[in-house]
């Protein structure tokens, strides 16, 4: 069962217990927590960029917030005390579609975050109940494990090459997640990620998600990296990243140093009309003296010109008291001006694949360490020395890895983890060195 079929089946089972009218379910990169591969049925697909930006731009029932909470489930109406206007997502998108409540669930385990689900309920049905939340809380751990195992199946076969020969894949977006430009090579890649509707260009949600995560990081909502690894097909993984293009500062030529002419008059040097007497030079210009005097006088009088005074700050004396500011989920976005966002798509690196492989199969830290040493060509003796364990312990770790991954030897493990058989010749030459368990 792939991840989409799994999610469809889980939702069908949920409908018998929890009533909902729409849903959004994303897989996530287990480390960065950024969403990929959405499975959704919502009434606002044309507003997808706005919805994604709002979802990432608030900590209110955010999946990363729920990961650190006592429960993996959050009910929107309960969280805001019935005042839905406090929710940014509701104000900017859901309010126009008669959404009355949202049940948010994160699916995470000790190996990472594997997805999050938002169930929407029409305002005519009434809010979600505590019983609904308890049910979702009970099933969340099992669903998290199932999602993780689904991701692990993407490593069963050696990756089929999908490299494009048309150059780098990059898109630029503004802060409202509108596509501004794209490289010519992006079309083929994006259509593989998300086949487009006829007459429309394909823009997978992963592009919007990494861009929205960058905006969230810039505004201080969440500090995870703006990147995500997504499975394309046949064991092939792509990494999607977002960054902000920086503007080069305008450089002005340094002013030429002032040439000071001096004239020796009876052993005295004149500098700008000031005489140096007894080795002491007075170089204070009249304008500087006047300016200094004005600054001192202003400080003594307790203020400056009205145009230079700092306006009162909210919550400080003379301003608006802090406790009068309404408690509302206010967006902290930067304005949609200035440098644009750039999103790149590239083949996932070997190191990133190894990390993902270890997490999806639930390897222990020591098994993960051993896998990394195998990847750089270590044999059993060298690995035992580096891990400071016996060779027998290395063999035990290998047996555990083989059992979890379904592989029968280290060559198969590495070929699946790295997505290629290249570079494994050294491992293939050591069949007797603890290669099989």
Residues of each region from the PLM?
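Long, intrinsically disordered low-complexity tandem-repeat segments
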Residues: 259-301
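Short amphipathic alpha-helical segments
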Residues: 3-16, 87-91, 156-160, 164, ...
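Recognition helix of helix-turn-helix DNA-binding domains
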Residues: 364, 377-412, 436-437
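The N-cap/first-turn positions of alpha helices
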Residues: 366-370
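PAS-family sensory domains
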Residues: 165-233
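PAS-family sensory/regulatory modules and their coupling/dimerization elements
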Residues: 210-263, 293-296, 300, 313-349
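Short, basic, alpha-helical segments at the C-terminal edge of helix-turn-helix-like DNA-binding modules
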Residues: 410-421
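Regulatory input/activation interfaces that engage signals or partners
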Residues: 1-145, 149
């Amino acid at each position: 069962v792939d991840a989409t079929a799994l999610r469809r089946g889980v939702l069908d089972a949920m409908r018998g217990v929890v009533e909902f009218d729409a849903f959004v379910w994303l897989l996530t990169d287990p480390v960065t927590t950024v969403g990929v591969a959405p499975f959704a049925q919502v009434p606002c697909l044309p507003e997808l960029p706005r919805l994604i930006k709002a979802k990432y731009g608030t900590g209110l029932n955010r999946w990363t917030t729920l990961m650190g909470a006592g429960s993996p489930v959050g009910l929107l109406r309960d969280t805001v005390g019935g005042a839905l206007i406090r929710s940014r997502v509701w104000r900017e998108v859901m309010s126009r579609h008669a959404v009355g409540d949202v049940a948010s669930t994160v699916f995470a385990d000790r190996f990472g975050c594997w997805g999050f689900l938002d169930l929407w309920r029409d305002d005519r049905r009434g809010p979600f109940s505590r019983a609904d939340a308890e049910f979702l809380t009970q099933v969340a751990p099992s669903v998290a494990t199932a999602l993780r195992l689904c991701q692990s199946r993407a490593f069963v076969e050696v990756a089929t090459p999908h490299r494009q020969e048309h150059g780098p894949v990059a898109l630029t977006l503004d802060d409202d997640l509108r596509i501004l430009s794209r490289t010519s090579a992006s079309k083929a890649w994006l259509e593989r990620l998300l086949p487009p509707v006829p007459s429309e260009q394909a823009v997978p949600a992963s592009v919007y998600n990494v861009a929205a995560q960058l905006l969230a990081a810039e505004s201080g909502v969440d500090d995870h990296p703006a990147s995500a690894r997504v499975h394309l097909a046949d064991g092939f993984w792509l990494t999607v990243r977002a960054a902000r293009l920086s503007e080069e500062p305008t450089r002005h030529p340094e002013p030429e140093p002032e040439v000071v002419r001096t004239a020796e008059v009876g052993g005295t040097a004149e500098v700008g009309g000031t005489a140096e007497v007894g080795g002491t030079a007075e170089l204070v210009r009249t304008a500087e003296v006047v300016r200094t005097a004005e600054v001192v006088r202003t400080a003594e009088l307790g203020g400056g010109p009205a145009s230079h005074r700092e306006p009162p700050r909210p919550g400080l004396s003379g301003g608006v008291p802090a406790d009068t500011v309404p408690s509302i989920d206010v967006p902290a976005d930067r304005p949609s001006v200035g440098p644009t966002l750039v999103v790149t798509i590239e083949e996932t690196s070997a190191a990133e694949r190894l990390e993902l492989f270890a997490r999806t199969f639930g390897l222990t830290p020591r098994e993960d360490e051993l896998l990394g040493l195998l990847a750089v060509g270590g044999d059993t003796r060298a690995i035992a020395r580096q891990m400071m364990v016996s060779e027998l312990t290395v063999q035990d770790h290998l047996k555990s890895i083989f059992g979890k991954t379904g592989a029968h030897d280290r060559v198969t493990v590495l070929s699946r983890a790295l997505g290629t058989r290249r570079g494994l010749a050294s491992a293939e030459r050591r069949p007797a060195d603890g290669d099989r368990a």
